[in-house]
């Protein structure tokens, strides 16, 4: 992927946006927008950033008007969203986390990391080292059986790896990318 290839441009008049309408966010369309002052780098410059804590359809938009007022908005992409509320029902929208940094992009990143560690990660491993795990996908793709997985687990254990994640192919008749996705019946072959 190209997730570390930052896309930057001048703040033009009118609207500029990043969005996804395919049911997910990803490294292709990430729910993040930042406005920076000219010359901003990792250590210097002002940053105003927004990150949507949601993995579905989204839109992040920046608008500069004729009076040089700038407005940033972010939320669920309304083009692909419909929610009918009945009397007395509630809808809790996903949250947007906003960060301001006067010390560049590095401080913005550290602020996000600290906030998410304190407020979003709900794990017993929030403040301690997480167990090391290995995923069998790159080693086996769809071609694995019990013996092959046990061999991987034994070798991994020698290196201090504590958990094996059995990836795609454990369910249904899933031995290629275009079949059985979502068939959660264990494939014992």
Task: Walk through the language-model features, giving the residues of each.
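Aromatic-lined carbohydrate-binding/catalytic grooves of carbohydrate-active enzymes
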Residues: 125-189
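N-terminal accessory beta-strand-rich subdomains and adjacent acidic, glycine-rich linkers
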Residues: 1-116
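Short, low-complexity, polar/charged sequence segments that are solvent-exposed and flexible
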Residues: 68-72, 113-119, 151-155, 184-185
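Long, charged amphipathic helices and adjacent flexible linkers at domain junctions
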Residues: 112-132
């Amino acid at each position: 992927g190209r997730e570390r290839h930052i896309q930057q441009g001048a703040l033009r008049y009118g609207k500029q946006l990043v969005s996804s309408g395919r049911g997910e966010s990803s490294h292709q369309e990430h729910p993040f927008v930042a406005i920076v002052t000219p010359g901003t780098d990792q250590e210097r410059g002002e940053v105003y950033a927004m990150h949507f804590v949601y993995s579905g359809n989204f839109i992040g938009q920046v608008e500069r008007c004729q009076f040089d007022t700038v407005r940033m908005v972010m939320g669920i992409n309304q083009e692909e969203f419909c929610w009918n509320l009945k009397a007395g029902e509630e809808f809790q929208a996903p949250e947007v986390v906003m960060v301001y940094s006067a010390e560049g992009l590095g401080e913005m990143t550290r602020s996000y990391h600290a906030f998410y560690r304190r407020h979003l990660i709900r794990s017993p491993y929030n403040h301690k080292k997480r167990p090391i795990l290995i995923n069998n996908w790159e080693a086996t793709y769809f071609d694995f059986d019990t013996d092959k997985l046990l061999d991987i687990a034994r070798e991994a254990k020698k290196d201090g790896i504590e958990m094996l994640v059995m990836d795609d192919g454990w369910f249904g008749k899933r031995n290629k990318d275009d079949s059985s996705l979502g068939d959660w019946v264990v494939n014992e072959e």
